[in-house]
Amino acid sequence: MAKRRPKKPMLKFPKRMQKKMIVMFTVVAALMIGLIGRLMYIEYTSGEKYEKIVLAQQGYDSQTIPYQRGDIVDAKGTVLATSIAVYNVILDCSVLNDDEKYVEPTINALVSCFPDLTSEQLYSYLKDSPDSRYIVLAKRLSYDTIQPFVNLQEERDEKGKLVNPYIKGVWFEKEYQRQYPYGKLASSVIGFTTSGNLGINGLENYYDDTLNGINGRQYGYIDGDDNLQRTTEAAVDGYNVYSTIDATIQGIVEKYLKKYNDENKDSTREGNGAQDAACIVMDVHSGEVLAMASYPTFDLNDTRNPEALIGSKLIDVSGNSTDTVINEEIAASMKQEENNDLLVQNLNALWKNYCINSTYEPGSTMKPFVAAMGLEDGRLKGDESFECTGIIEIGGYKIRCHNYTNGAEGWLSIGESIERSCNVTLIRMAQVIGIDEFLKYMSEYNFGLKTNIDLAGEARTASLVFNSSTMGPTELATSSFGQGFNVTMIQMITGFCSLINGGYYYEPHM
């Protein structure tokens, strides 16, 4: 006979532990009651809202509402860049295939209103993609173009009933297309956009975040009566950018840059009158840029047209400039797909803003700065005269005055030295100023530093100017007439403004 197992003694919790467990169960029960109450409250107050969200997720896709990118306007309010509404024609095959009576009226309406569409093409969409709800039939049409179809959809008789109730499954997706009313005007300053409202170059790039907005969204849901309802989150449009550019002054500057190039085309060499020509007009008392132009230019509404490259030097696929001048034949060949890399290299050069992107030796435009250095420092009193001997030897190099062939200029005042652009007398002024002071004022005038103008791509020149370890007597001499170092146009004009306005250096801005 088997022995009975002894019963295990009952586990007995200490009173302290029992109290803790009671408290714990009470808290859990209270939390559960609170949670159930909260769920009941949500169901009572917001149940319909969340039900609609679930239904929308189950049966309907949300639709993006595009924002409108801000305008770029000139100082007087003239619109230089704007965004216009355009429409994509969208076909919902699932709606048409849901009822055969919709097919023929809808296809006939589409073909009659949009000549580029054919009934064969539309029937093939219905057959090959019967469940598709999004087929793009046409892109970026103006409202005037889609209006005849919209009128057919919305036309009503005297009793208010739809005249064409079986035109279904077609809707228009709104988006915005960038447009530049003045085409080529200020093209290198304004810049342009690519798909997705991405600013390329100029103000479009620098103020990209300001100009762009936030897309809205429209959601569909099924209500209690099985009707489709919609809720909308509105788009937030971008801000406008008000520039300092004066379209009238800009137009005059561009007119004469083009005139010069047209008059000198193929004169001394094949191609444009100048490889690069540019001009800046600035308010000396504020640093506001009233006009900034480069030549050659391009149409902002047709930025990839290779015909704009005709007359410029060809740049190879590696980015190196060649001696070949682009003609009509070369430009036409760039339209071929296999030459896309070549086209891109040359367009990138065309799209650059020479006024801020490129550097050059300033030459004799540096001479007023040298005179101002000496006068400001006190090492020049203003009544000195310096002798031009026609030639001067510095560090073993013979440096000539530009008028050397006609003899020496003789004794010249500071003003006469600048007026006659005499290299020799400017060298003598620089020697009086000295290397240390000369370099100090080069920095004061911002040479070698960025101006921080509000345009993308300002060139760095820190390595293109002399410093205390690279400037000797010869470099001091050549720098006095603007050779041996590089500047940008925006550096030069901003510095010049400080010479004119009493010594105030204003940060240039657009």
Predicted features by range, described:
Residues 1-332, 359, 436-444:
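Periplasmic/cell-envelope proteins involved in peptidoglycan metabolism and beta-lactam response
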